[in-house]
Amino acid sequence: MCGHSLGEYSAMVAANAISLQEGLSLVHKRGKLMEKCPKGSMCAVLNVDLDVINEICSKVEDEIKTIVTPANLNSPKQIVVSGTEEGVDEVINRLKDCGYKKCIKLKVSVAAHSKVMSNTLDQFENELNKINFSLPEYPIIQNVNNKIPNNIDNLKENLLSQLVMPV
């Protein structure tokens, strides 16, 4: 089983790693914590290689001292960039300057799967530790590392990591 980003919680419920109530509780608390983070932005970039996006994001981070990174690796031809408003806007401008025109700004105010979400880690880890996890009855391919967890700590670590890492 697998679920992308928030869908990983659905996969855990379907695999009986957590109950439906626990899944809903975690998703709700995750959302509330994300809302408390600094505002951010996300943009879907189409038909640009990941290497090009990584290079531009890295240069923008270094040059203007901001956070911007590939966040959702939806397909080889659709990658979502996430970070500060300033960082995402600069990546869009540089992509367009290089001739890449397909950049679609998402209607969100959070920078999911980026270091902008770092403030959530300690609190969300506390929430994860309140949940009664079980090993999944069916294999779950985790988002951050593309592996099947072999223990409960792996399940928790992945849910925590996906707040600040690409999925």
Regions from the PLM with identified roles:
Residues 1-2, 81:
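Helix-rich "cap/lid" substructures immediately adjacent to catalytic or cofactor-binding pockets
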Residues 14-166:
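Alpha/beta catalytic cores of group-transfer enzymes, especially the acyltransferase/condensing modules
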